[in-house]
Structures are given as C-alpha cells and as structure tokens.
Amino acid sequence: MSKAKFERNKPHVNVGTIGHVDHGKTTLTAALTRVCHEVWGTGESRAFDQIDNAPEERARGITIATSHVEYDSPTRHYAHVDCPGHADYVKNMITGAAQMDGAILVCSAADGPMPQTREHILLSRQVGVPFIVVFLNKADMVDDEELLELVEMEVRDLLSQYDFPGDDTPIITGSALMALEGKDDNEMGTTAVKKLVEALDDYIPEPERAIDQPFLMPIEDVFSISGRGTVVTGRVERGIIKVGDEVEIVGIRDTTKTTCTGVEMFRKLLDEGRAGENVGVLLRGTKRDDVERGQVLCVPGSIKPHTKFECEVYVLSKEEGGRHTPFFKGYRPQFYFRTTDVTGSCELPEGVEMVMPGDNVKMTVTLIAPIAMEDGLRFAIREGGRTVGAGVVAKIIE
C-alpha cells in the first residue's frame, strides 16, 4: 500500500478526547473520522475497534497505550489521541507524550460529571492544556430537556472551578453512537459531530509553531576550539539563532550574556540554526569553564532560572521498572530537566502521608540549583540514573 502524501498546506492542530470511563470517548473519536470523511470527503473513516485496541508505546520509559487518528475540517488537519484507560490519560498528559493544543471533554448527558471528569479537567489545568471544548454525549438517552440543561450547567461550573472559562466554553450536545452509525435524528448524530469540528476550528486558536517562538537551545556539550573560542552544541528547541544575535546562558549559575559568532551543522558553517536542528553555536568571549551541560542558550529575558515550583507527577509502578516502595515527604531524588539532573526535595500536599508506585500526585519541589524553566516544562524523576517518575511544572513559585 503506498502511503498517502501528507498535505502540509493546512495548519496542524493536536487534540484529544478526555473524560470519564464509558462516557463515549472512543466512540466519539471514531465518529469524528467518519463524519469528516462523509461531510467533507477528507481523511479515512476509522472503526471503533480499530481505535479501541490501542497499541502500547513507551515515552520516557513509561508504557502508555494510545490511539492516534487524524481527520480534516475544510481548513485544518487534526491529529487526535484517545487512550483506553484512565491511567493512560494520566501518564500521557503528564509526560506530554501527546501534547494537546486543545481537548475534547466527553461527558455523558445521562450520568453528568463523574470523578474522572473532574480529574481530567484538573490534569488539563496542571499540565497546561490551553482550551477545552465539551461534547455532551448520549443525549438520545435523555428525554428531559431540563436535565440536559442541568448537566450542562454542572460541566460549566466544574470547568470554572479549575480556571477554564466555563461560561464561554462551547458545549455541543449529541450522540456519538448515532453519528458513528450514520444516523441524525433531531440533528443529534452527524450534525452534532460536524458542529463539534466547527467548534474546534473556531475556538482553538492555531498553535504557534516552534520556529516562530523565541529561540531556546538546551546545551548538551561544550567544546573549545583553539583560535575560535567556545562552541556549545544541542538541538534547537524553538525559534531561530542567527550569527550576530545576542543570547543569554541561563540556569545552574548566574545568567550571563554573550553573542553568537557562528553556527555550524555537520562541520559546515551556516547563517542560522532553526527549531529541530542539531547545531553548534560559537560564543564570543566565553570560556570553556563558563558554560556547562544543563544550561540553556536563549533570547535575552525570554526565560528565567527558578528553584521552587509546584508540579504534577506520575510515579512509575514496580512493573514499569519504578520503585517497589512508597516515598514520603522530604524525598530527595534527582530531577532531570532537558539535559541534566538536579537534586531536589519534595513537599507533599496536606493530608498526603506517602506516595505509592503507580500514583499521580501534586507536589512542591525545591531544587539545589536553579534551572531555566517555565510552566509546562516536562521532567523525569530519577534515582541514580534510573527513571522512577515523570512530571510537569504546573506553577513556578520562586
């Protein structure tokens, strides 16, 4: 089978379904592929069972079962992730294995918000999912118009509780199963899912591409080249670095400023290095000992070093090669940010005495050295080089 050519002419947006078990996330995922294919003739229709037996992937040493599907509206290409189990969502969102530009919260109109509805909204807030659109599913099972309105109000309240704009969030009511079966009684099937895609188009802004963001490169290695000066190497995470640009070196020690006097790739000199490329950057007047792995090179003022932050963490289970025993407050592992480990101590939330392998928990971490960080930065938790957890910065404290 020849692979279909990937069209790059449409903006690409990453989304995913979230919500309580059995509220219809996977059915809706299948319905989205079917409706886009039928209404706009784009993409391929995928069956429920093609999505439901999600393959397991490994991200940062953690096994996650995830299904990836794609579909197109007339103006956009969507890449959509769906997970079979609650634990997979927790891992997926914390590791950032599937970064979402927006989430589709699926909530059964017959049951209303349930524990995982709340937990997934909280996780979305903690890991920095910027936008949520709601699909009130199974509306064909609810005869009472007032009940639908009540559930809608509950969902809006829940979103507002976690600092999402509950009052302005688009909520589409319908039945994913009807849409999947090609039915559309009372516009609850195909029409509702088409409306959902239109809401995604309108409500989730086009994500800013990595190349348009301010330049940042984690430093992996440092060399001195006689007669030329100091070269730092790494993969450009975002933005563009041009010869002559002023840059800052941030993290671990005091922030310093310098100028890029050369960019090279595969021993060839370039005018610039771009997001995604592995480059060497020559720094003016910087000594070999002034820079180290774990610092970042960036646009001056674009990112600051911090030592204390609140984070959401997933602790690997024993089966995943994690710890065999719980940890308690005052636990001091290494936190691996981008290219280096920094020791830090953990404070647990009030009322939480210990954290078991396989749990997810919110905690406050204090590092022994500052790291260039911003909300949404992912990290691994390690003990002597072995990964025992994954986390994401939810809020910087100092």
From Swiss-Prot:
List localization entries. Cytoplasm
Renumbered to this chain, region (G5) spans 175-177
Query: Annotated region G1: where?
Result: 19-26
Which residue stretches belong to region G3? Answer: 82-85
Which principal EC class is assigned to this enzyme?
Answer: hydrolase
Keyword presence, Metal-binding: yes
Residues of the region (G4) are 137-140
Q: Pfam families, alphabetically?
A: GTP_EFTU, GTP_EFTU_D2, GTP_EFTU_D3
InterPro entries given in the database record: EF-Tu_GTP-bd, EF-Tu_GTPase, EFTu-like_2, EFTU_2, G_TR_CS, P-loop_NTPase, Small_GTP-bd, T_Tr_GTP-bd_dom
Could you name the domain of life of the organism this protein comes from?
Answer: Bacteria
What is the protein's known function? Answer: GTP hydrolase that promotes the GTP-dependent binding of aminoacyl-tRNA to the A-site of ribosomes during protein biosynthesis.
Name listed for the protein in its UniProt record: Elongation factor Tu
